[in-house]
Regions:
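Short amphipathic alpha-helix that is part of the acyltransferase structural core
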Residues: 3-43, 47, 52-54, 62
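Conserved beta-hairpin
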Residues: 48-68, 81-84
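Short hydrophobic/aromatic beta-strand element in the GNAT-like acyltransferase core
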Residues: 50-54, 66, 104, 109, ...
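Conserved acyl-donor/pantetheine-binding loop and adjacent beta-alpha core of acyl/acetyltransferases
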Residues: 68-109
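Active-site acidic-Proline motif in GNAT/NAT acetyltransferases
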Residues: 113-115
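Conserved acetyl-CoA-binding loop-helix of GNAT-fold acetyltransferases
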Residues: 118-132
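Conserved GNAT acetyl-CoA-binding A-motif
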Residues: 126, 133-147
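Conserved active-site alpha-helix within GNAT-family acetyltransferase domains
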Residues: 148-168
Length: 186
């Protein structure tokens, strides 16, 4: 059964990173993410390595979240393909059985300001990405991928949003490769 995409109306604005967006003091409390957003994301966005977005309060235009998207491909094992076949239209199943690599959008970085964590903003961002790839159809996308920071809180966050671990091989690594089948959503 497909899940309906719902996120609450809010006082937040999501828009592409603009030249006047100042991320120099943005902090989510994770040094590697803070460094990326403060020092690298503008360059990566400018040169189309990724597309960065900011989440702002409509009231005071304060940046409370940042995320970046890039194109990706996910290769699935035959067992994984079998698991998703029942969610595929019959007319497309023959194609599914002939391929093991699928187009995806990668949430390459996602962070919420330390002052705003625990308020559902990260969840809203992921739901926004699902809507973006599912409804706008800006390119062929069947999956959303993420390399989740490998800690219990972050892994639980993505698992609660129906992401699956790609494998158990990265269990002890710094990040865990996870994916979400966008065909699970209306």
């Amino acid at each position: 059964m497909r899940k309906k995409i719902e996120y609450p109306a809010s006082d937040l604005l999501i828009q592409p990173l603009a030249p006047d967006d100042d991320l120099s003091s943005f902090s989510c409390g994770v040094n590697s993410l803070d460094d990326f957003f403060q020092k690298e994301v503008v360059f990566c966005h400018k040169h189309s390595y990724l597309t960065a977005y900011v989440v702002k309060s409509k009231k005071d235009k304060c940046i409370i979240g940042v995320f970046a998207l890039s194109n990706d491909v996910i290769s699935l094992e035959e067992d994984d393909v079998e698991d998703i076949k029942d969610k595929i239209d019959d007319e497309y199943k023959f194609m599914l059985s002939r391929q093991l690599s699928f187009p995806a959008v990668n949430i390459s970085h996602l962070a919420v300001s330390s002052d705003y964590q625990g308020r559902g903003i990260g969840r809203m961002i992921v739901l926004y990405v699902i809507v973006l790839v599912k409804r706008l159809r800006f390119s062929g996308v069947q999956f959303i991928t993420v390399d989740s920071m490998n800690n219990p809180r972050t892994n639980k966050f993505y698992l609660d949003l129906n992401f699956s671990n790609r494998s158990i091989d990265d269990f002890g690594a710094e990040t865990r490769r996870m994916f979400l089948n966008v065909m699970d959503f209306e």
